[in-house]
């Protein structure tokens, strides 16, 4: 299994509607991309105060690295990317991606 983790610094004026649309777009990728097993999206709820400005995040569980690689260039993923960019804060490091 491969866990693809994405942290987002969303614009301060992000609306509840935009948040729901983003969640829906991400979760809808399940069943469309081979090997993508699960997508979880949420806003930061940590009480620790160590989020460094990251307000939202999601993770995706893939069967293996090959499935993750398919996702990276998959047309359905490419359709979601512009919406993610639209809700990001206007700063150079508004997104962080790691795979485990």
Predicted regions, residues:
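Charge-dense polyanion-binding interfaces
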Residues: 83-100
């Amino acid at each position: 299994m491969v866990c693809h983790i994405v942290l987002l610094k969303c614009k301060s004026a992000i609306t509840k509607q935009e948040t729901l649309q983003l969640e829906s777009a991400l979760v809808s990728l399940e069943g469309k991309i081979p090997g993508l097993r699960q997508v979880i999206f949420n806003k930061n709820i940590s009480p620790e105060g160590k989020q460094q400005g990251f307000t939202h995040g999601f993770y995706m569980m893939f069967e293996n690295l090959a499935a993750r690689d398919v996702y990276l260039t998959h047309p359905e993923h490419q359709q979601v990317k512009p919406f993610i960019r639209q809700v990001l804060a206007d700063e150079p490091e508004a997104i962080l991606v790691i795979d485990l």
